[in-house]
Amino acid sequence: MESVAYILILTMALAVLFFAIAFREPPRIEK
């Protein structure tokens, strides 16, 4: 159970960082 909660926390942290960077700077990432 602890591993599942740990993975959820890591995923949420990565999502927060991603959205923070994405909304802080104009999107210049081109695929």
Swiss-Prot record:
Protein's membrane topology: Single-pass membrane protein
Q: Name one GO cellular component term.
A: plasma membrane-derived thylakoid membrane
InterPro entries from the xrefs?
PSII_PsbT, PSII_PsbT_sf
List membrane-spanning regions: 3-23
Q: Name one GO biological process term.
A: photosynthesis
Main localization is membrane
Cellular location(s): Cellular thylakoid membrane
How does this polypeptide assemble, per the annotation?
PSII is composed of 1 copy each of membrane proteins PsbA, PsbB, PsbC, PsbD, PsbE, PsbF, PsbH, PsbI, PsbJ, PsbK, PsbL, PsbM, PsbT, PsbX, PsbY, PsbZ, Psb30/Ycf12, peripheral proteins PsbO, CyanoQ (PsbQ), PsbU, PsbV and a large number of cofactors. It forms dimeric complexes.
Q: Which HAMAP family match?
A: PSII_PsbT (MF_00808)
The family classification in the record reads: Belongs to the PsbT family.
Q: What does this protein do?
A: Found at the monomer-monomer interface of the photosystem II (PS II) dimer, plays a role in assembly and dimerization of PSII. PSII is a light-driven water plastoquinone oxidoreductase, using light energy to abstract electrons from H(2)O, generating a proton gradient subsequently used for ATP formation.
PANTHER family in UniProt? PHOTOSYSTEM II REACTION CENTER PROTEIN T, PTHR36411
Q: What is this protein called?
A: Photosystem II reaction center protein T
What is the originating organism of this protein? Gloeothece citriformis (strain PCC 7424) (Cyanothece sp. (strain PCC 7424))
